[in-house]
Amino acid sequence: LALEPDVVIIAAGRVGGIHANERYTADFIYENIAIQTNIIDACKIAQTPKLICFGSACMYPRNAQQPVKESSLLTGPLEPTNESYAIAKIAGMMMCKAYKKQHSLNSICLVPTNLYGPGDNFDPQSGHVIPSLMRRAHLAKVSNHRHLEIWGSGKPRREFLHVSDLSSAIVFALS
């Protein structure tokens, strides 16, 4: 290979909010598995010293006890609205584990919670919860609407993490 990186961080992937996850199930599973598969295997070939991949909070069962424990992974059904994305992220994590065992690939899988920050997708239909709610609130305000549509039942607990905090966690994980 022309490049011999010291570290590879798989941050690429197809992401979206509830609407996008429900509508583009095949795209979410195919694109995310393809990205992870190609990069993980390239790291094996290049003998990359360190690889970080990302899982997702949605990898955990829909009815996992809160706060979620790492041990609850793969213990129950996933949230149907983002099952394809969750399965793709689980596949990436398991692939890292298998490549570590068989090929001694030095990898770690970080599982951040819901991210937000600069450059986010503020589309009310395809964005994640914080940016899409911000956009919907803004549109309601400028249009003088008295109501704001919020999707879901309101029952799920969510945690949020600013991308700068994730960056700090990545640096820590690499040390």
What is each residue range found by the language model?
Residues 1-32, 45:
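NAD(P)H-binding glycine-rich loop region in Rossmannoid oxidoreductase-like domains
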Residues 7, 35, 50, 74, ...:
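Conserved cofactor-binding/catalytic machinery of classical short-chain dehydrogenase/reductase
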Residues 10, 37-82, 108:
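Conserved Rossmann-fold NAD(P)-dependent oxidoreductase catalytic core, especially the SDR/UDP-sugar
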Residues 17-18, 53-68, 84-90, 101-102, ...:
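Conserved catalytic-site region of short-chain dehydrogenase/reductase
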Residues 35, 39-43, 95-96, 169, ...:
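Hydrophobic positions on the long internal alpha-helix
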Residues 38, 62, 80-113, 132-143:
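Active-site Tyr-X1-5-Lys
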Residues 81-85, 113-128, 152-164:
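Glycine-rich "substrate-gating" loop/helix at the edge of Rossmann-like oxidoreductase active sites
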Residues 101, 115, 130-148, 158-175:
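Alpha-helical substrate-binding/gating segment
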